[in-house]
């Protein structure tokens, strides 16, 4: 076969693909994914509280906002403490850590616009602005001690994730009161939850399992995809 050489002018025209050849160009559309982690079993017993994080993706960048009790803790059931926000730039790094607990994480993905994604990034940037950066314990992540402490009811992984989700998906938790029942909590924990609110049940949804029930039922926003990560309890 004769070798054909192309001049610079020909190269500038680009590569022509024959009509019978098929090619696939994959474009990443802006997406927000609510990640809800389930219970898991550890050496010290069952951990039923669950976890939640928010993943935001565009064609240019990806962030997973992961808030939790990653610092000093205290209070009843260790439900209070330093508010630590981890910001991951690689999903596999984040989810491999969650999978290592033996839990299942369910991801609810929604299409958004680039502008909406940028607003979510800006939302968390404003939270981080007043934070103290800490040395990260994990690759592909940065860690911040926020000005506001962690609280198991009023400022936890679920409330932090929903605060960003609402920026892109206004009203996603508008009917959350119907699902705010404390799934994953023991009876003593529920009594303590009422105690922190002067005997009344907290008004805002705060348990990851309750958020999952809401996302699985409500139709204001229908996820483009629901994906399960990890093998769950054995």
Can you annotate each of these PLM segments?
Residues 176-188:
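Aromatic sugar-binding interfaces of carbohydrate-active proteins
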